[in-house]
Amino acid sequence: MFIRKSQNLTGALFMSISMAGYVTNDAFMKLVGSELGLAQTIFIRGVYCSIFIFILFMFKNEKNLKGCFNHFKIITARSLLELFATIFFLIALINMSFANVNAILQTLPLVITVAASVLLKETIGHKRAIAIICGFFGVLLIIKPGTNDFNSYSILAIFAVLSVTFRDILTRKMPKNLPALFLSLVTSFIVTLTTGIYLVFFKIWAPID
């Protein structure tokens, strides 16, 4: 019981740190994306992320990589969901207020919990179910569907939430011995490669001062 609580606390700590990183990243992406364009911004960020993750990956010296390629299909599917989530979210972020986008993102833990209950057969419980319902109503009060603040870009933000939800469900189904850095590296590489091909094909590149 103590071990499980300790694991939950560790997971919550890393989740909090990652969320702080996400918010910082979102602020910079909104600032830069409006100047350079979506694809170029994702590509440049992807190059730096891929290099950084690759250095960490080499430093950690993962040896159990042969078995990773046995799960290539699910890893690729997860990476594509990450790509869709990134595109949907950043389009919404660039064209909406920061507050409204993040208000929609507040539904993410609620949607993931419901999806885990349906797809992974995880137990929610009455108290948690009531909290989820209240949470959804709270988010609806913030985003106010039907008003001018809720537009087509809001729908893209919702698609981003759904993409992240299915991405996390796939992640949950992956073997626990699959190196997280390998998964992150493949995901970053696929996202960067896809946007890079798009930039080359359409020859879209804004000068960087």
Positions of the model-derived regions?
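Hydrophobic transmembrane alpha-helices of multi-pass small-molecule transport proteins
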Residues: 127-144
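Membrane-interface interhelical linkers
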Residues: 1-20, 50-77, 126, 178, ...
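Hydrophobic/small/kink-forming positions within alpha-helical transmembrane segments
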Residues: 19-24, 54, 79-87, 109-114, ...
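Structural motif at transmembrane-helix junctions in multi-pass transporters
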Residues: 34-40, 88-105, 176-181
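Transmembrane alpha-helical segments that form core, pore/gating elements
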Residues: 27-30, 38, 53, 149-206
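Specific transmembrane alpha-helical segments of multi-pass solute transporters/efflux pumps
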Residues: 61-99
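Juxtamembrane helix-entry segments on the extracytoplasmic side of multipass membrane proteins
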Residues: 7-11, 43, 67-71, 139, ...
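C-terminal transmembrane-helix exit sites in multi-pass transporters
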Residues: 89-91, 108-130
